[in-house]
Curated annotation (Swiss-Prot):
The gene is eps5J. Its EC number is 2.7.-.-. It comes from the Bacteria. Belongs to the stealth family. Keywords: Exopolysaccharide synthesis, Transferase. InterPro entries: Stealth (IPR047141), Stealth_CR1 (IPR031358), Stealth_CR2 (IPR021520). One of its GO terms (molecular function) is transferase activity, transferring phosphorus-containing groups. Stealth proteins are part of a protein family that is conserved from bacteria to higher eukaryotes. Family members were first identified in microbes as proteins that help pathogens to elude the host innate immune system. Microbial stealth proteins are involved in the biosynthesis of exopolysaccharides. Stealth proteins are predicted to function as hexose-1-phosphoryltransferases. This is Capsular polysaccharide phosphotransferase eps5J. One of its GO terms (biological process) is polysaccharide biosynthetic process. It holds the Pfam family Stealth_CR1. The keyword Mitochondrion does not apply.
Length: 238
């Protein structure tokens, strides 16, 4: 199993110039789409690798995904590190890209990536020891059955709303809940279980994401037009 992590240095002058060149000027950019916090770097990313080394030394490879940037302290010769630039796996018609959703929907295209992998953002840190079975059981992703009420009141929440619409086109609403109710209403979730009591349109609870690469391929097969439209947006607003 591999780990995949996305990183960008929003303070890099070259990155700022490139981003400004492609920022639309014919409409107002929503703060959810483009703000300094979306591309922020607090100078703590090296601790992400230290936490992996400490809490998951068994991981196969770590794929660091960037637009070509790399931290100055990064040891690119480490045997477990695979530094991958956007142009190495994202179709050229999508580039340049400042849309994390478009980057994530192409992760399965990375050469050499294991079938089972876990996707992190650079602000998601391991804080205790983990093992393979924390992420996959019988080669299936181990997920949290916790849902939050979802209302597309902002451009960012519309991303989750669109994701749910796609899922509902292929999977009956609440079928899993009816088949396995105790996976949704389990005392191990503590107070988080209360989220599942809401009856609104539901989106996922935000945490790390464990995937199988073939799922990405299947989604592109069934929803290629939708993903193409999303992927050609430089900024994250669909």
């Amino acid at each position: 199993m591999d780990f995949v992590v996305l990183w960008v240095d929003g303070n890099d002058p070259e990155f700022i110039r490139e981003k400004n060149k492609y920022t639309p000027h014919n409409r107002k950019i929503d703060n959810d789409e483009d703000n300094v916090h979306r591309y922020r770097d607090y100078g703590t990313f090296n601790y992400w690798f230290r936490m992996v080394e400490r809490h998951a030394p068994w991981v196969n490879n770590i794929y660091l995904i960037t637009n070509g940037q790399r931290p100055k302290w990064l040891n690119v010769n480490h045997p477990k590190l695979k530094w991958v630039r956007h142009e190495e796996f994202i179709p050229k018609e999508y580039l340049p890209i400042f849309n994390a959703s478009a980057i994530e929907m192409n992760i399965h295209r990375i050469d050499g990536l294991s079938e089972n992998f876990v996707l992190f953002n650079d602000d998601m840190y391991l804080i205790q020891d983990v093992k393979y079975s924390d992420f996959f059981v019988n080669e299936k992703p181990k997920l949290l059955a916790i849902y939050e009420a979802l209302v597309p009141w902002s451009r960012f929440s519309k991303i989750y709303f669109n994701d749910v619409l796609v899922l509902y086109r292929h999977f009956p609403n609440k079928k899993a809940l009816r088949q396995s109710p105790f996976k949704f209403f389990n005392i191990k979730y503590g107070q988080l279980m209360l989220k599942n009591r809401l009856h609104n349109f539901h989106g996922g609870f935000t945490h790390y994401r464990n995937y199988r690469a073939k799922i990405g391929r299947h989604i592109w097969f069934f929803e290629g037009n939708f993903l193409f439209t999303s992927g050609t947006k430089c900024f994250q607003f669909i």
